[in-house]
């Protein structure tokens, strides 16, 4: 299935397209920082062989199914006593959703959600991740190869308003046009003291775009709050 082209207005925050995939992967494997990270996490890996395998991959879907799936299973085995979930059968595979959760680890929470989806042969979600975590260009490239959406942080008020409008527009586009689900944390920062409330500014951001009433703009995003 061919990807729907993403409008240029979202080009600096959206996941890389499959048309960009091989070029971006070639740039990534040449980065010293990427080599250091991979060999630190997997010290026994044949890095040159690993890179050769990566360069044979053509799409984000192939990358997630052939590389990230095994990595996430290994990560879950090393960091948890097991992952459990229920009611996944209630998620309609023919619909796209905005999945909102609290989070204690912005990487692991979304990763384990996508691991559950992969186990059940569902499409993975795109993952909204703050730009403050992307301290090197190669890290930003890696997460965008892996279906991440950039949430711009550390902006002045005027810039923040523009970024919120851009992000809202992209999420609406992803859900209604690309038919991709999106995961986003329900509040900025880690959940603390059993606080499980959704940040009001997040709801306002999601409702900016859609061209309808606030309620209808939210309804078209098919929000699942976990």
Tell what function each PLM region has.
Residues 1-97, 103-114, 140, 145-147:
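Membrane-anchoring hydrophobic helices of lipid-metabolizing enzymes
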Residues 78-226:
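Soluble catalytic domains of membrane acyltransferases
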């Amino acid at each position: 299935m061919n990807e729907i082209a993403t409008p240029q207005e979202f080009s600096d925050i959206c996941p890389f397209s499959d048309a960009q995939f091989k070029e971006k992967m070639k740039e990534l494997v040449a980065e010293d920082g990427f080599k250091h990270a991979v060999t630190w996490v997997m010290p026994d890996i044949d890095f040159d062989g690993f890179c050769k395998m990566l360069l044979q991959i053509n799409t984000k879907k192939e990358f997630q199914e052939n590389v990230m799936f095994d990595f996430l299973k290994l990560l879950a085995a090393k960091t948890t006593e097991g992952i459990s979930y229920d009611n996944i059968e209630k998620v309609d595979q023919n619909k796209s959703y905005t999945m909102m959760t609290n989070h204690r680890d912005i990487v692991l929470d979304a990763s384990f959600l996508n691991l559950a989806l992969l186990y059940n042969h569902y499409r993975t979600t795109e993952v909204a991740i703050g730009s403050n975590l992307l301290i090197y260009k190669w890290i930003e490239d890696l997460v965008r190869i892996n279906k991440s959406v950039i949430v711009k942080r550390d902006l002045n008020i005027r810039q923040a308003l523009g970024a919120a409008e851009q992000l809202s527009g992209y999420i609406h586009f992803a859900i209604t046009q690309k038919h991709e689900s999106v995961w986003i944390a329900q509040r900025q920062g880690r959940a603390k003291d059993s606080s499980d409330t959704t940040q009001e500014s997040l709801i306002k951001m999601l409702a900016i775009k859609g061209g309808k009433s606030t309620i209808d703009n939210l309804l078209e995003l098919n929000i699942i709050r976990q």
